[in-house]
């Protein structure tokens, strides 16, 4: 993308954020749908770091005695609920978490996984044999899409989630969430094996009694813990 195209993209997104904020101010209504842009505002982490204040985001890492890294590069207000899931799993496994902390338009902080090159994430990925990444996508149906390069384990995980009462499916490498790109941060580990878990907005909302930035931390419910326990059981049984 040229510099002129990048500037135009940023201007468009800023205008959108202004209009969305005006809508909220005038009506008190905040749309629950997630707006997706065909192009991220920032082409990589260095680009984001150059243009965003440090208090707009947070990076949380924890190294555990485990060959599994839980990766959540779109946490906080970017893909709500993935931060809380990652932090819960950090009690047992290594974790890298990038969180959007802006008051609005956290989607501007979304850097697609193929371009996500935050130094600590790259370093942690290289030290672990396997990566399980957590993402969110917009869907009114409670559902889980499971991709990644570790296709056999992805199928097993989908089967386990379905047995535990969730709706889940393993997706092909050609799916838009397939996660097979060589430069995908989740694939930059020792083995190149990854599982990419995409959780619908409806399912993430169901995991909390109050699905807000401030409310999620203290309103985790049975669905939340059923998900994390299912994933932990899967890791114990398959790695």
Where are the regions that the model predicts?
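Function-determining sites in protein domains
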Residues: 14
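Bacterial N-terminal signal peptides
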Residues: 17-29
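Intrinsically disordered, low-complexity segments enriched in glycine/proline and serine/threonine
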Residues: 7-8, 17, 132, 201
């Amino acid at each position: 993308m040229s510099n002129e195209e990048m500037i135009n993209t940023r201007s468009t997104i800023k205008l959108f954020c202004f209009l969305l904020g005006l809508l909220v101010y005038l009506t008190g209504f905040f749309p629950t749908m997630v707006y997706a842009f065909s192009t991220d505002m920032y082409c990589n982490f260095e680009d984001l770091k150059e243009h965003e204040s440090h208090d707009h985001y947070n990076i949380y890492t924890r190294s555990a005695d485990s060959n599994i890294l839980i990766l959540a590069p779109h946490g906080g207000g970017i893909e709500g609920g993935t931060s809380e899931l990652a932090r819960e799993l950090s009690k047992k496994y290594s974790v890298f978490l990038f969180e959007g902390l802006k008051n609005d338009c956290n989607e501007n902080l979304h850097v697609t996984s193929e371009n996500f090159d935050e130094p600590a994430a790259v370093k942690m990925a290289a030290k672990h044999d396997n990566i399980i990444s957590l993402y969110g996508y917009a869907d009114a149906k409670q559902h889980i899409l499971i991709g990644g390069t570790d296709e056999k384990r992805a199928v097993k995980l989908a089967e386990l989630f379905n047995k535990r009462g969730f709706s889940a499916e393993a997706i092909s490498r050609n799916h838009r969430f397939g996660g097979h790109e060589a430069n995908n941060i989740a694939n930059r580990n020792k083995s190149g094996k990854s599982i990419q878990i995409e959780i619908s907005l409806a399912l993430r909302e169901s995991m909390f009694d109050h699905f807000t930035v401030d409310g999620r931390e203290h309103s985790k419910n049975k669905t939340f813990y059923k998900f994390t326990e299912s994933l932990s059981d899967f890791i114990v049984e398959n790695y």
